[in-house]
């Protein structure tokens, strides 16, 4: 139990700005539980966003326009901008139309290109639109937990089973300690957490099923694509999957509500 707890704290230290004032040893069991806890780290970010949304709704504070923008940036800030940076690096690399080796070098470059800026603006514009429309429809706060939970589940799976692009970097430093079994653990924990949201959070069964299927299809499709385009998985690729996954899932929520109302 202590090792599980340490892995969870390590996931929060690595993937969020939540202050964890504790030094945790980087070893095999802690890293395995870090990967297994990735969905729960997403759920922690989502819980803070859900609490903010619930309080604002309870006290009628802010318009849907304001809440959509505020909650959009709150999620990015709570993740430390780490995944947004990955999205930008992957965009720059992909739109260079170079070979996989050169794309890896571009992702390692700290400079920001035009395609990085344009793609991030496109990503966040659509996410803001989906948030705005769904907040107007008075969605349950638990959806703010479910979506980052599922996006990190896909990333944990890809990190555990995907081919590595290189032998250095964040993904490689984690991968040496883990296997496909850790992806199974992460998915089981995500399923249990999602089940709790179904029972206690008011998330409809069909909505949960649609979100889970959409994220599974995205992750399954991402694996061969990133191996072809970038030579494999990197930390930036995982960040891009998380950010792209969240926008996709909010789009699914928007489509479901639009269909129900239309």
UniProtKB/Swiss-Prot annotation:
Primary localization class, coarse: membrane
An annotated Gene Ontology molecular function: cobalamin 5'-phosphate synthase activity
Record GO biological process: cobalamin biosynthetic process
Keyword check for Metal-binding: no
Cofactor(s) needed by this chain: Mg(2+)
Keyword Cell membrane: yes
Cellular component, GO, one term: plasma membrane
Reactions listed under catalytic activity: alpha-ribazole + adenosylcob(III)inamide-GDP = adenosylcob(III)alamin + GMP + H(+); alpha-ribazole 5'-phosphate + adenosylcob(III)inamide-GDP = adenosylcob(III)alamin 5'-phosphate + GMP + H(+)
Protein name: Adenosylcobinamide-GDP ribazoletransferase
């Amino acid at each position: 139990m202590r090792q599980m707890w340490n892995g969870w704290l390590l996931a929060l230290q690595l993937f969020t700005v939540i202050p964890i004032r504790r030094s945790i040893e980087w070893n095999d069991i802690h890293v395995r539980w870090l990967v297994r806890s990735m969905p729960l780290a997403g759920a922690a970010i989502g819980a803070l966003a859900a609490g903010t949304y619930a309080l604002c709704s309870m006290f009628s504070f802010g318009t849907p326009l304001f809440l959509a923008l505020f909650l959009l940036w709150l999620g990015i800030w709570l993740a430390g901008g780490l995944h947004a940076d990955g999205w930008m690096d992957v965009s720059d690399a992909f739109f260079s139309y170079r070979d996989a080796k050169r794309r890896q070098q571009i992702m390692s470059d700290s400079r920001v290109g035009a395609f990085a800026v344009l793609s991030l603006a496109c990503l966040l514009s659509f996410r803001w639109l989906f948030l705005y429309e769904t907040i107007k429809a008075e969605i349950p706060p638990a959806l703010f937990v479910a979506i980052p939970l599922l996006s990190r589940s896909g990333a944990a799976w890809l990190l555990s089973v995907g081919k590595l692009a290189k032998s250095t970097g964040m993904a490689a430093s984690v991968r040496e300690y883990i296997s496909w079994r850790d992806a199974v653990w992460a998915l089981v924990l995500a399923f249990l957490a999602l089940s709790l949201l179904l029972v206690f959070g008011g998330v409809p069964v069909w909505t949960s099923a649609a979100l889970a299927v959409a994220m599974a299809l995205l992750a399954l499709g991402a694996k061969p694509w990133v191996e072809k385009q970038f030579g494999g998985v990197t930390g930036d690729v995982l960040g891009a999957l998380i950010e792209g996954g969240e926008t996709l899932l909010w789009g699914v929520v928007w489509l479901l509500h639009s269909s129900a109302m239309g």
